């Protein structure tokens, strides 16, 4: 497992990801945390989520806060924050489309792991390979609290890997077959709050429990 993550945008095409450090201000982070607290305070008892390869109703969890931006103006504005857009546009260029948004909140001692996966294979309405995920940290993230891990270069050739059941208690209920050598090459994306990462939608990534 590696902790020296790529911060050079010129290496994105080869590595499949890049970190952008200290993108948001302290005021931005404070506002985001307050808005998130409001969402968590109003979490419903049940949610319909995509898990185990199908839509199903489950007990609500803070990892399943999907699509906040159409309902809450703050999250839409955060998605198009000038500095967030600067990072996103540095890779594919200025013509961007927001496909979806998702807040993943991992409570201490209870946060679910996310098994190895490729984002693109879960976005059934999305076609093409010029697709990236922007992942923004509003709390400090490290391996101890379940930061994201990426296996560099696994997007090359844009393989659509077969999904298999995890058989465990995790966010997706599905994973892909990853060799020990691939896991050894994984990089922990440890970031301070306000930093973000951009990764190719085909690159393998996941995270451990908090």
Functional labels for PLM-detected ranges:
Residues 141-208:
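Double-stranded beta-helix
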């Amino acid at each position: 497992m590696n902790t020296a993550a790529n911060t050079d945008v010129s290496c994105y095409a080869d590595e499949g990801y890049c970190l952008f450090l200290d993108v948001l201000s302290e005021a931005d982070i404070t506002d985001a945390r307050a808005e998130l607290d409001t969402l968590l305070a109003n979490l419903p008892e049940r949610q319909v989520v995509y898990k185990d390869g199908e839509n199903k109703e489950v007990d609500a969890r803070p990892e399943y806060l999907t699509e906040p931006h159409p309902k809450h103006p703050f999250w839409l504005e955060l998605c198009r924050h000038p500095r967030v857009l600067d990072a996103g546009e540095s890779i594919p260029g200025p013509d961007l489309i927001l496909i979806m948004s998702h807040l993943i909140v991992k409570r201490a001692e209870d946060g679910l792991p996310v098994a190895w996966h490729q984002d693109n294979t879960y976005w059934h309405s999305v076609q093409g390979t010029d697709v990236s995920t922007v992942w923004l940290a509003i709390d400090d993230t490290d391996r101890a609290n379940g930061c994201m891990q990426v296996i560099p270069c696994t997007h090359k050739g844009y393989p659509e890997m077969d999904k298999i059941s995890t058989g465990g208690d995790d966010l997706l209920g599905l994973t892909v077959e990853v060799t020990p050598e691939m896991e050894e090459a994984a990089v922990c994306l440890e970031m301070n709050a306000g930093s973000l990462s951009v990764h190719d939608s085909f690159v393998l990534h996941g995270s451990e429990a908090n």
